[in-house]
Amino acid sequence: MGIRKYRPMTPGTRQRSGADFAEVTKSKPEKKLTKYVHRKQGRNNQGVITSRFRGGGHKRLYRFIDFKRDKRGIPAEVLAIEYDPNRNARIALVQYTDGEKRYILHPVGLKVGARISAGEDAPIELGCALPLEKLPLGSNVHNIELLPGRGGQMARAAGAVAQLMAKEGDYATLRLPSGEVRVVRKECYATLGQVGNLDAKNISIGKAGRQRWLGKRPHNRGVVMNAVDHPHGGGEGKSPIGGKPQTPWGKSALGTKTRKRRKPSSKFIIRRRKTASGRG
């Protein structure tokens, strides 16, 4: 994938860049693998805003992605590489020898016509899914299960890759894209390779309207609100916060850990992810 620069014909295109879609080989999705999903606009089932600054955006068809890779021992061929509006990564359409078609995340280097498979006896090749206990140390993997049979939950975004660092007893140690080091059961499946579309993080939006196409509404700061709306609000003119940074609901912000202190899975985290302040 490459980055396409736009000529500065208007203020909106002056700083704009986008993907060149060079790896995409098919424009229309597989109809049986799509579904229209009503967009929640950041509301819950009572219509109350639970996630601010969301709404609008272009209509999307949801593509059903095979995160479980549960067709074990059946080879598949890559038919096409497609664009998915629901994620930054590209997706690959594969067809198994029994005729079934599925979508999977497209790893870097996987070409149309390549053959992949999943299972304990699958080859150690790009795009194949195997249990962690069958993979050699140092392998780069993505779409990693947290619990056996649940389906991949970690390292699924564009450019994401985790590394298998150790295998000891019933557990395997992984270094995740965030820098976190954690252990998971060796029976958990992972897919070999790095998720494609590496330059997704380097794209410049260019104008506010393009954010609206993505369903993102303007994010206004608390310091410009009224005192009734935010702890940072109020005052005459440009006034400071007058205290420690807080969320709209009065909780401490900027650097405060938000993970539950007694979460059972914390015992599987060997080293926490890196933070902006440098504290793990």
From Swiss-Prot:
GO terms for cellular component: large ribosomal subunit. Keywords: Ribonucleoprotein, Ribosomal protein, RNA-binding, rRNA-binding. Residues 257-280 have a biased composition (Basic residues). Transmembrane segments: none annotated. Residues 1-25, 230-280 are annotated as: Disordered. GO terms for molecular function: RNA binding; rRNA binding; structural constituent of ribosome; transferase activity. Pfam families: Ribosomal_L2, Ribosomal_L2_C. One of its GO terms (biological process) is cytoplasmic translation. PANTHER family: LARGE RIBOSOMAL SUBUNIT PROTEIN UL2M, RIBOSOMAL PROTEIN L2. One of the primary rRNA binding proteins. Required for association of the 30S and 50S subunits to form the 70S ribosome, for tRNA binding and peptide bond formation. It has been suggested to have peptidyltransferase activity; this is somewhat controversial. Makes several contacts with the 16S rRNA in the 70S ribosome. Part of the 50S ribosomal subunit. Forms a bridge to the 30S subunit in the 70S ribosome. NCBIfam families: rplB_bact. Belongs to the universal ribosomal protein uL2 family. This is Large ribosomal subunit protein uL2. It comes from Gloeobacter violaceus (strain ATCC 29082 / PCC 7421). The gene is rplB.
